[in-house]
């Protein structure tokens, strides 16, 4: 495939945008080459500025559960835009989508909409600190909760892709209030709690990690965190920016039967438009202004276009309960196919999967945390990425990202992908 137009556009972008992109991982620095500039997308496919058609396994980093340009979402946004794009005032639709979300997700009474997953996680931490009157938080190495200062301590996703999981600009004081734990290591968490008794406001976690590849929680790990939080007056925060409304109708709380105290959302809840949200039981949410002392605000929070897109998306997921079964079946089919061809070609690899989230690690594994995820062969991944791109399959340009499956994918698309992986892996 040729990417002449994308190369030209990237050169122009570099003149006026730092690094030529508005989010670092898009720049292809981890894999080399020139980033692909997208012109349009429909269903399971991307169409770039050079006219190439690509099967998409990024899906805007997760929210396109039903595929790109899903018609009910498109129609809802168009109709709402005709009535005005932003008011900075309450609208009826905000209440409707809030009620729908509360009905779908276990253990939440109220929800507050913001503009991104970063903002949702940042606000959730502030709320937890205000509610508990404590300052410290525990996060897990390799988990990514957005680019707020408190979270850029051994973060996953783009931060680790660029080799800088601890960002300059994060003050020493901020860093001291963020305690770092090992994912899937309950004893390590216990040690941190004992060493900081009565000081920890919250533990925040991607219950299924998606920013160091897809890493599932070990058996008993989430329940262990729940028990530790309950015993020590700590709030348990599930970051469901990737998993919410994707792995199950009610997210990971439903999937694993574990209740969080606060849940954060993004991506899916906006149908692809910029939206985030955080939710909890009433006594916690009532600490938010204007009811309580914890301040959080936003001019564009609950804006009508995002609410229209999100409501159409959640309605579709709520009405068709078989979507999650189809996603599971399609992703299991893809997993089996990848496993078969990589083994046949004598590739050293590990596949991790939970529902419609999947990742391929070029290491014998097991891959269970940040340390083991970092052992993957990045040179092999680069060959894998560019080989698939030439075959018309687009995965994330980073070895530390998850693939997201959409209901719009057909089994013919999956077979095409498996055959492409077979062809590419023969060249390793």
Curated annotation (Swiss-Prot):
Pathway of action: Porphyrin-containing compound metabolism; protoporphyrin-IX biosynthesis; 5-aminolevulinate from L-glutamyl-tRNA(Glu): step 2/2
Subcellular location field: Cytoplasm
Presence of the UniProt keyword Transcription in the record: no
Keyword Cytoplasm: yes
Keywords: Cytoplasm, Isomerase, Porphyrin biosynthesis, Pyridoxal phosphate
CDD domains from the UniProt entry: OAT_like (cd00610)
Family membership: Belongs to the class-III pyridoxal-phosphate-dependent aminotransferase family. HemL subfamily.
Subunit structure: Homodimer.
HAMAP family: HemL_aminotrans_3
Name under which the protein is recorded: Glutamate-1-semialdehyde 2,1-aminomutase
Species of the source: Flavobacterium johnsoniae (strain ATCC 17061 / DSM 2064 / JCM 8514 / BCRC 14874 / CCUG 350202 / NBRC 14942 / NCIMB 11054 / UW101) (Cytophaga johnsonae)
Lineage: Bacteria, Pseudomonadati, Bacteroidota, Flavobacteriia, Flavobacteriales
Gene encoding the protein: hemL
């Amino acid at each position: 495939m040729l990417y002449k137009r994308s190369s030209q556009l990237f050169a122009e972008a570099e003149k006026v945008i730092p690094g030529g992109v508005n989010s670092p991982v898009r720049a292809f620095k981890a894999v080399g080459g020139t980033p692909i500039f997208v012109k349009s997308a429909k269903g399971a496919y991307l169409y770039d500025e050079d006219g190439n058609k690509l099967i998409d396994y990024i899906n805007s980093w997760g929210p396109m559960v039903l595929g790109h340009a899903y018609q009910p979402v498109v129609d809802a946004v168009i109709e709402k835009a005709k009535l005005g794009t932003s008011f900075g005032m309450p609208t009826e639709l905000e209440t409707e989508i809030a009620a729908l979300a509360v009905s779908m997700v276990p253990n939440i009474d109220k929800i507050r909409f913001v503009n991104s997953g970063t903002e949702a996680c940042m606000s959730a931490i502030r709320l937890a600190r205000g509610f508990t009157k404590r300052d410290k938080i525990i996060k897990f190495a390799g988990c990514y909760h957005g680019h707020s200062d408190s979270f850029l301590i051994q973060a996953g996703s783009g931060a680790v892709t660029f080799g800088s999981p601890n960002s300059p600009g994060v003050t020493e004081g901020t860093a001291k209030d963020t305690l770092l734990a090992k994912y899937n290591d309950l004893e390590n968490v216990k040690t941190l709690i004992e060493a900081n008794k009565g000081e920890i406001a919250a533990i925040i976690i991607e219950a299924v990690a998606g920013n160091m590849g897809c890493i599932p929680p070990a058996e008993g790990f989430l329940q262990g965190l729940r028990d530790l939080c309950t015993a020590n007056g700590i709030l348990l925060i599930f970051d469901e920016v990737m998993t919410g409304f994707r792995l199950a109708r009610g997210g990971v709380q439903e999937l694993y039967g574990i209740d969080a105290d606060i849940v954060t959302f993004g991506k899916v809840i906006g149908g692809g438009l910029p939206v985030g949200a955080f939710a909890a039981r009433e006594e916690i949410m009532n600490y938010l202004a204007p009811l309580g002392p914890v301040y959080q605000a936003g001019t564009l929070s609950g804006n009508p276009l995002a609410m229209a897109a999100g409501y159409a998306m959640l309605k579709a997921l709520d009405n068709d309960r078989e979507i999650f079964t189809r996603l599971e079946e399609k992703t299991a089919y893809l997993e089996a196919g990848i496993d078969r061809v990589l083994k046949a070609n004598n590739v050293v690899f590990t596949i991790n999967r939970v529902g419609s989230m999947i990742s391929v690690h070029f290491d014998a594994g097991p891959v269970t945390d940040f340390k083991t995820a970092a052992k993957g062969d990045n040179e092999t991944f680069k060959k894998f990425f560019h080989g698939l791109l030439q075959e018309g399959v687009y995965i994330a340009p980073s070895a530390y990202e998850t693939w997201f499956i959409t209901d719009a994918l057909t089994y013919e698309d999956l077979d095409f992908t498996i055959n492409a992986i077979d062809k590419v892996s023969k060249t390793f």
